[in-house]
């Protein structure tokens, strides 16, 4: 259905802009933005007087599979370091996931992301006991909520060669399904695959990998081959903890990013999550390749791994949550306050630009104009019930983002021109959904207790 939003205060992050206009939404896009637009036949008119409309938020690094971890059974003992956090908590959780719990984790995580005003997720998935078609399970859950997603499966050597190869194949299958394979060249290649389903409007893939310290050179090389085959980037954790840096130096006499570059697993579409302990040479290599750095401040604080050298990164800094929900208003606020504590010298405006970089990343992956309200841009939008107690103008927009706006103000969410949340109500039956999720989590937790 086409919509006409009347009397809206609109904001965009890049460029920072605040204005007042009507917006016509048609065919999944902003068809027109102007003052005093006249309603057309068949159009639903929605009065947004006193409300703010803006492009939806993007989360550049998350793990939907952790959504049912909230309140999970305590590990056998208290982890003493980051490696033990992985071994005693997260690697046990991902091994316990099955088809049902993958689905409910993704569904709950996607719904809570939508309620926070996040319309696109870059999800990094792992479920070593149920690898094949796991990305389609995540996709189905996200699609039910109505979100946009860029998915990948975590390739690692942790489970041996068979599971590594299954992870690679899962990435390959999803990339092919998402229509990201190059145009068929050989004359005998069947065209049936592309005719089987319409190329999805709201899903894309990347090649996923865990981290340098759980990947052999051979594994990095096959990841690189897949990246070249589908012309996509790698989504990987780098130097989150010193263990990653020390392992690369001890076993390969190399920096973490240097290893990726040597094996061909680094390009301008790559997402390097964390980067907490990257040295100058590795940062230089990443910058020369044009790779993206995904900062995850709340996760870094929670895991006590340190603070990333953000001032040395390029302007391709992103913001992620590493699985702690997908509330980008909250993550940006934590990022701002932590940067102040670390005396980084950044104000609120730098974090406005980082949030805008997330939208720019998504625009590049989808080949669409996201993060804009111009005519022709994709209608991934959120409506905020935010009453500014002080003037709201382009020059102080960032300060309102950090000190005023929050996910509690999100009233409506639209993805690809369709409402996902409307007047704070989702398109789903939330009560039944959460009841089913609780049952699934109890079964998941029972598995954890047996490990």
Where are each of the predicted segments found?
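Metal-coordinating catalytic core of metallo-dependent amide/deamination hydrolases
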Residues: 130-277
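Histidine/acidic-residue-rich catalytic or RNA/ligand-binding cores of hydrolases
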Residues: 72, 242-254, 282-287, 304-314, ...
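Histidine-centered catalytic micro-motifs
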Residues: 56-67, 125, 233-242
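His/Asp/Glu-enriched, well-ordered alpha-helical/loop segment
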Residues: 262-265, 269, 309-388, 405
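Active-site gating loops and adjacent loop-to-helix segments of metal-dependent hydrolytic enzymes
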Residues: 68-102, 131, 158-160, 167-172, ...
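Active-site microenvironment of metallo-dependent hydrolases
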Residues: 1-21, 26, 31, 36, ...
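Alpha-helical scaffold segments that flank or form the walls of functional sites
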Residues: 72-124, 129-147, 171-184, 438-442
């Amino acid at each position: 259905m086409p919509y006409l939003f009347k009397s809206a205060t609109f904001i965009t992050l890049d460029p920072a802009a605040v204005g007042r206009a009507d917006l016509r939404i048609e065919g999944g896009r902003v068809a027109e933005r102007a003052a005093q637009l006249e309603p057309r036949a068949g159009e639903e008119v929605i009065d947004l007087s006193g409300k703010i409309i803006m492009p939806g938020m993007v989360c550049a690094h998350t793990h939907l599979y952790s959504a049912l971890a909230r309140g999970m059974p305590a590990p056998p003992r208290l982890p003493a370091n980051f490696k033990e956090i992985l071994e005693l908590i997260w690697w046990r959780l991902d091994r316990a996931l099955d088809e049902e719990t993958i689905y409910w984790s993704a569904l709950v995580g996607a719904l809570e992301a939508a309620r926070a005003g996040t319309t696109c997720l870059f999800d990094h998935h792992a479920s070593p006991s149920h690898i094949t078609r796991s990305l389609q399970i995540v996709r189905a859950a996200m699609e039910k909520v109505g979100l946009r997603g860029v998915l990948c499966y975590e390739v690692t050597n942790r489970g041996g060669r068979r599971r590594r190869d299954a992870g690679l194949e899962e990435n390959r299958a999803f990339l092919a399904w998402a229509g990201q394979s190059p145009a068929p060249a050989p004359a005998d290649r069947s065209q049936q695959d592309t005719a089987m389903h319409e190329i999805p409007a709201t899903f894309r893939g990347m090649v996923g990998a865990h981290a340098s310290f759980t990947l052999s050179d051979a594994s990095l090389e096959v990841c690189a081959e897949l990246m070249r085959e589908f012309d996509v980037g790698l989504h990987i954790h780098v130097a989150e903890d010193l263990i990653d840096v020390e392992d690369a130096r001890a076993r390969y006499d190399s920096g973490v990013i240097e290893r990726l570059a040597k094996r061909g697993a680094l390009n301008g579409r790559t997402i390097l999550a964390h980067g907490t302990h990257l040295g100058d040479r590795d940062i230089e290599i990443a910058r020369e390749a044009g790779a993206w750095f995904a900062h995850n401040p709340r996760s870094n604080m929670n895991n006590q791994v340190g603070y990333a050298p953000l001032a040395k990164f390029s302007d391709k800094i992103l913001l992620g949550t590493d699985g702690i929900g997908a509330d980008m208003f909250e993550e940006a606020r934590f990022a701002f306050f932590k940067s102040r504590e670390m005396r980084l010298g950044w104000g609120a405006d730098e974090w406005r630009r980082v949030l805008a970089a997330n939208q720019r990343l998504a625009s590049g992956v989808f080949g669409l104009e996201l993060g804009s309200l111009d005519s022709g841009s994709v209608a991934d939008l959120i409506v905020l019930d935010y009453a500014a107690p002080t003037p709201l103008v382009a020059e102080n927009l960032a300060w309102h983002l950090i000190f005023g706006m929050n996910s509690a103000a999100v009233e409506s969410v639209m993805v690809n021109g369709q409402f996902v949340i409307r007047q704070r109500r989702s398109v789903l039956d939330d009560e039944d959904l959460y009841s089913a999720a609780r049952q699934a989590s109890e079964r998941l937790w029972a598995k954890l207790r047996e490990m």
